[in-house]
């Protein structure tokens, strides 16, 4: 395996229905990563706040979306926006000497944003797959792509992989 990972963030049953518009591209990115011996990682969000209505642990809403291809057991859970706050994921990154990431998933203005910001702050190479991310507010995606680029991320459409 290469020292690279495709990280699919929060494509779960409770995420915005807008994910259905990019799930085909996300699945194509998963196929690409597998074909190129790139680790495929799935990040799940669990909301630990009292009284939460979404992403509750051990509920259908917290499960990965059924129309997403699952090609590895690299499934990590986080309770904060930044995927690197998952100790299990951070350990996986270190154990596999991963230094370059391809990012897909949701939400572009929250968990994707926090994850790519913190990956760049840690000097990792980060490539955001522009047609593999979504948001509750799709109008903000272009703004987020500019933000990611301003932080040193490469912005690439799936067809340019």
Region annotations inferred by a language model:
Residues 1-5, 24, 28-36, 53-161:
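Active-site-adjacent betaalpha module
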Residues 8-9:
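Short hydrophobic beta-strand that contains or immediately precedes a catalytic carboxylate
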Residues 12, 46-47, 107, 133:
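Catalytic metal-binding/acid-base residues of hydrolase active sites
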Residues 12-18:
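Short acidic, Gly/Ser-rich segments with clustered Asp/Glu that frequently serve as metal-coordination loops
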Residues 17, 50-51:
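Glycine/Thr-rich phosphate-binding loops of Rossmann-like dinucleotide-binding domains
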Residues 19, 23:
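Flexible, glycine- and charge-enriched loops at secondary-structure boundaries
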Residues 33-49:
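Von Willebrand factor
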């Amino acid at each position: 395996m290469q020292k690279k990972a495709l990280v699919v963030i929060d494509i779960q049953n409770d995420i915005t229905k807008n994910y259905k518009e990019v799930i085909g591209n996300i699945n194509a990115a998963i196929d690409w990563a597998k074909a190129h011996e790139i680790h495929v990682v799935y990040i799940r969000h669990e909301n630990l706040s009292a009284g939460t209505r979404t992403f509750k642990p051990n509920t259908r809403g917290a499960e990965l979306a059924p129309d997403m291809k699952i090609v590895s057991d690299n499934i990590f859970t986080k309770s904060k926006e930044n995927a690197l706050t998952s100790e299990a994921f951070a350990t996986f990154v270190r154990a596999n000497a991963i230094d370059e990431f391809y990012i897909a998933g949701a939400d572009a203005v929250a968990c994707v944003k926090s994850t790519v910001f913190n990956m760049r702050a840690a000097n990792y190479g980060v490539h955001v797959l522009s047609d593999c991310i979504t948001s509750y507010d799709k109008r903000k995606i272009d703004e987020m792509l500019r933000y990611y680029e301003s932080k040193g991320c490469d912005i690439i459409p799936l067809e340019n992989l």
